[in-house]
From Swiss-Prot:
Cross-referenced CDD domains: MFS_MefA_like (cd06173)
GO molecular function annotations of the record: lysophospholipid:sodium symporter activity
Any Pfam family hit: MFS_1
Family to which the UniProt record says this protein belongs: Belongs to the major facilitator superfamily. LplT (TC 2.A.1.42) family.
Gene from which the chain derives: lplT
Protein name: Lysophospholipid transporter LplT
Cysteines engaged in disulfide bonds, as pairs: none
InterPro entries noted in UniProt: LysoPLipid__transptr_LplT, MFS, MFS_trans_sf
Regions of this protein lying in the Periplasmic compartment: 1-17, 74-90, 166, 248-256, 302-304, 365-366
Entry GO terms, CC: plasma membrane
Length: 397
């Protein structure tokens, strides 16, 4: 496709529609593939501790490529970067379908996701401007939430029919995302001709990390969001083992329904935070963070499905109320110090590092034979204590 000189900045331009469709299909595939691959591990009798390791290889790719993916997105047409990234995801999903090692295939998907992330947000500013950019971000987030809900449930439901059906559906979703990327205009690269010296790129990224860590407000935000997303991913895997033990349900669909309750709650909590919390009153979100841990503790003791649904939605509401103001604080302060792109890249590194650490601890707990209910109780207690400590630190500084 030839390069476009004049960009149609309409919110519903052909290019914007292609971006939103590609994002939905790509995120749908990501979430469906997780639960489809977990079902494959169960069917092939992998040990239970290997389940969180699957996500660890995914986030490991994010961490490994964090210093470089931003420059990749800026050095080439972002639509083509998105196409390449979705192609990697398609290759990973297809390799799992055809019987290759699921951990290797899922690592390929993780590399694709790492490359995709900065390009998908960066292209919005190239396709729209002004107030339309805010609305475009809203459309992107709405399509992502819809994909998380539908993809998670589809992965579990289709896996109950047949694991290969679920895996094939994921590959088709990625193929659809690649096809949608074709319709994104080939815009000029934002910053072509940059140095590809790995050492210089790493040092530049390290400088951005240091700058944000030395600022009290951005450090507070980085720690808070990293704790939240690390805990959120760990909760996903906790549910997979908790459901058969606490509820006596052994299908693949029920954990995905429960995860969907958390996602719905996050949307509601995010809406409440937008109305009730400002950058000047960010500390209002901290009690919600502490309550997340308390509710996880009570949730772990449940043995009925309906209360479990209700408590997980409450966890989501508290989570949305907690994390949205912290995200806004980091973006605002980070934009003024290291730039919005660098701030997001550093945030991704922090969040994925927290995921890797928490999943590692969870996997170790399962490996040594600690029952899932005590793991849940300990997990909730430690999270509440960690957020309490963060709040005390923030008030003192």
């Amino acid at each position: 496709m030839s390069e476009s000189v004049h960009t149609n900045t309409s919110l519903w331009s052909k290019g914007m529609k292609a971006v939103i469709v590609a994002q939905f299909l790509s995120a749908f595939g990501d979430n469906a593939l997780l639960f489809a691959t977990l079902a494959l591990l169960k069917a092939q009798f992998y040990p239970e501790w290997s389940q969180p390791v699957l996500q660890m290889v995914f986030v490991g790719a994010y961490i490994l490529f964090a210093p470089f993916v931003g420059q990749v997105a800026d050095s080439f047409a972002k639509g083509r970067v998105m196409m390449f990234a979705n192609g990697l995801k398609l290759l990973g999903a297809a390799s799992i379908c055809f019987g290759f090692n699921p951990f290797v295939g899922y690592t390929l998907v993780g590399i694709g996701a790492a490359a995709y992330s900065p390009a998908k947000y960066g292209i919005l500013g190239e396709l729209t401007t002004g107030d339309k950019l805010v609305k475009a971000n809203g459309l992107m987030e709405a399509s992502t939430i819809a994909a998380i809900l539908l993809g998670s449930v589809a992965g579990g439901v289709l896996a109950d029919l047949h694991v290969l059906v679920a895996l094939a559906a994921c590959a088709l979703a990625y193929a659809g995302a690649v096809a949608a990327n074709i319709y994104i205009p080939k815009l000029a690269a934002a910053r072509p001709g940059q140095s590809w010296n790995v050492l210089k790129m790493t040092c530049s990224f390290k400088s951005a990390c240091t700058s944000l860590w030395q600022n009290g407000e951005t450090r507070f935000s980085l720690v808070g969001t990293s704790l939240f997303w690390g805990a959120g991913v760990t909760l996903r895997f906790l549910l997979v083992l908790w459901v058969p033990v606490a509820l006596g349900i052994t299908d693949n669909a029920t954990p995905t329904y429960l995860n969907a309750m958390v996602a719905i709650g996050i949307v509601l909590g995010a809406g409440a935070a937008a109305k009730l919390v400002t950058l000047e009153t960010v500390s209002r979100c901290m009690p919600a963070g502490i309550l997340i841990g308390v509710v996880v503790l009570f949730f772990s003791l449940q043995h009925e499905l309906l209360p479990a649904y209700a408590l997980l939605m409450l966890i989501g509401v508290l989570g949305g109320f907690f994390v949205v103001p912290l995200n806004a604080l980091l973006q605002e302060r980070g934009k003024k110090s290291v730039g919005a792109g660098n701030a997001i890249a550093v945030q991704n590194l922090g969040e994925n590092s927290a995921m890797l650490l928490m999943l590692g601890i969870y996997s170790l707990a399962v490996l040594v034979g600690i029952p899932v209910v005590p793991i849940g109780i300990g997990f909730g207690t430690l999270f509440a204590l960690a957020i309490t400590a963060l709040w005390i630190w923030q008030r003192r500084h």
